[in-house]
C-alpha cells in the first residue's frame, strides 16, 4: 500500500521544533525528507526535554523523534552549496526557517530559492510569528 505522499520530496532547511515537526509530518505521510545541516549540526541536537545537557554529536531524544524517517546530509556553507542546489532542483517543497548558519545565507533565503526554483513550494516558518525580525 502506498502512503499519501509517496514520491513527494521535501528539503528541510529548518532548525528548531516547528520546522522539525512540520517535516516529520511530511515524512510520516510518506514523503522523502532530506534534512540539510551545516557541519555544526542543528542546534536542536543539543536540546533535552528536561533542560539537562545533551551530547550534540549523539543527539537528544527530541531531535531523534523529529528526525525519524528523514535522510540527513551535511553541507559546508562555504563550499558545498551546489549540493543544496542539486537537492532543491529535484524536490517538490522546501521548509525553511531562520536560525542556522546554512539557512541564514542570502542565497538560501526563501525568496532567493523561489527565484531559482519556481517549481518548489517554499514554506517559511517565520510567517507564523508576529513581529519577526527576519526578512
Language-model segments: which ranges?
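Short "domain-exit" segments at the C-terminal end of structured domains
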Residues: 130-135
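N-terminal helix-loop segment corresponding to the beta1-alpha1 unit
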Residues: 1-129
Amino acid at each position: 500500500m502506498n502512503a499519501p505522499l509517496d514520491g513527494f520530496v521535501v528539503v528541510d532547511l529548518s532548525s528548531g521544533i516547528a520546522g522539525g515537526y512540520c517535516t516529520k509530518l511530511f515524512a510520516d505521510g510518506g514523503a522523502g525528507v532530506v534534512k540539510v545541516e551545516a557541519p555544526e549540526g542543528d542546534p536542536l541536537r543539543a536540546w533535552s526535554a528536561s533542560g539537562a545537557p545533551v551530547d550534540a554529536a549523539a543527539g537528544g531524544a527530541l531531535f531523534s523523534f523529529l528526525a525519524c524517517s528523514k535522510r540527513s546530509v551535511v553541507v559546508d556553507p562555504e563550499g558545498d552549496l551546489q549540493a543544496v542546489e542539486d537537492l532543491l532542483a529535484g524536490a517538490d517543497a522546501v521548509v525553511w526557517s531562520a536560525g542556522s548558519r546554512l539557512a541564514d545565507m542570502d542565497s538560501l533565503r526563501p525568496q532567493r530559492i523561489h527565484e531559482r526554483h519556481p517549481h518548489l513550494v517554499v514554506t517559511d516558518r517565520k510567517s507564523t510569528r508576529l513581529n519577526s525580525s527576519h526578512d
